[in-house]
């Protein structure tokens, strides 16, 4: 007879053997509809006993695989995002496929190609090319064309057809400067990352705005460098020679570099110069002095990003560009103090 009737006979045999309806057998084969684990096991056992091939569609395929692409995990803020994203993805019933970039070796694009080859169901980008005004955006357009849903974290250019979830950099910088102003500081400097990256650009704009509002300073002291300890230490001298009594940094790593450079120059933190970090990463409450810093709401950001991505995976809805901003808190510790004339 035809293959259709052969298939029907097979279904009937399996149903009889497993003592379930043919509809249930069909659900197990097609992976569609609700089947209890016990029933699925009965059907699979019947298939094995009758010598038929098990369905290719194993139940695991209903678990979404979510790619997470981050910069290097040596920076504690990215480790924090990785940890929280992994938890949120697992909590939503998915599997996180973490990929971190290694400078000069594996790029965001390499990771992306490998995830697409692994039939990933959705992707979360953290602080990648999406946040770079000089970055090539073709990779994101390619994902949109392939209908692979993705979301971004911490800054995205408006051309990218995906929602971005980020820390309110403007609110964070305003809180830091406001705190220093209350302590009597006026010559406040901002040390941040490269301004072609969205969060740095937002920090710089907010800093210029509040320095103008509070002190009528139109060209405040700023320095742009990498988000590393060494780069920050190297940039510190210029700011201090220019008379800064307080430095707001774009990351905790930068703040630690600034504190080291100030100490090497024989200055005390916070007696001579106040320093504010940004991120409130692990161990910043244990530094000496304990670091006053802007705390990124990592948990709120990751939960919202994961929930939005899972909704898109489940509904095949097309995502569009939206900016979701989560305001940070200023955590006041011991690296800031009232201004003393130098």
Which ranges hold each PLM region?
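Hinge/beta->alpha junction and helix N-cap segments in small-molecule ligand-binding domains
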Residues: 38, 70-80, 98-107, 129-132, ...
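Glycine-rich phosphate/diphosphate-binding loops that line cofactor/substrate pockets in enzymes
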Residues: 177-188
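N-terminal helix-turn-helix DNA-binding module of bacterial transcription factors
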Residues: 1-63, 340-342
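Short beta-strand segments enriched in small/hydrophobic residues
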Residues: 22-26, 59-74, 187-193
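Flexible loop/turn connectors
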Residues: 217, 238-342
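Alpha-helical recognition/docking segments in bacterial nutrient-uptake
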Residues: 2-6, 53, 63-178
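Short acidic/polar active-site loop segments enriched in Thr and Asp
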Residues: 21, 121, 186-187, 245
